[in-house]
Each structure stands twice: as C-alpha cells, then as structure tokens.
Regions:
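Charged (often Lys/Glu-rich) extended helix/loop segments that serve as interaction or gating elements
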Residues: 1-97
C-alpha cells in the first residue's frame, strides 16, 4: 500500500519487486495502485524475508532499518546498514596490497 496515499483511487496495476536481481524477488503482480511518484512511501506488510532475521547482504545490499509502529507512533529499532558496514571487517592480505 502507498502509506502516504491511502485514500487515493487506484489508477493502474503494477508489479512490486525487491531490490535484488532474481526473478523470484517479487512481492506482487498486477497490484492495483494509485499513481506512484518519487518520494511516495510504499508499505509492504508481512514481508518477513526483508526483516533483519531473514535478510542477507546478497549482492552487497546493506540491510534496511527497522521501525516498530505502535498506536500510530514510530520507533526506530535498528539503524540501516551502510556500505562501509559491509566491508569494515574485511582484511586484505599483505600480498594483495
């Protein structure tokens, strides 16, 4: 659902896909949606594989932040990873330097 356009009429059918280059990374096909613009907030409900416990850094993708919503109030529970976070524990052997 478009969280910032909950009352907007659906004007099109769209496919909603994840951010990795796999054909199975698909949330919905032919989903009725209102007009989508840059900056809109897409809420994907019940997407456990994109939660931290099932996420991975496949294709060097940083893990998303996590937000808990309770009674209309939002709480950040995990910060988004950065690209620096992905590589800060790697060690380059001396012979490669």
């Amino acid at each position: 659902v478009l969280a910032n356009k909950m009352d907007a009429p659906n004007t099109q059918e769209v496919d909603i896909a994840g951010n990795v280059c796999e054909s199975g990374d698909l949330f919905a096909r032919d989903r009725p949606m209102p007009d989508v613009e840059e900056g809109d907030l897409l809420a994907i409900l019940n997407a456990g594989a994109y939660g931290f416990t099932m996420s991975s850094n496949y294709n060097s993708r940083p893990k998303a932040s996590e937000v808990l919503v309770k009674d209309g109030e939002c709480f950040l529970t995990r910060e988004r990873e950065t690209f620096e976070d992905l590589f800060n524990k790697q060690i380059i052997p001396d012979y490669l330097q």
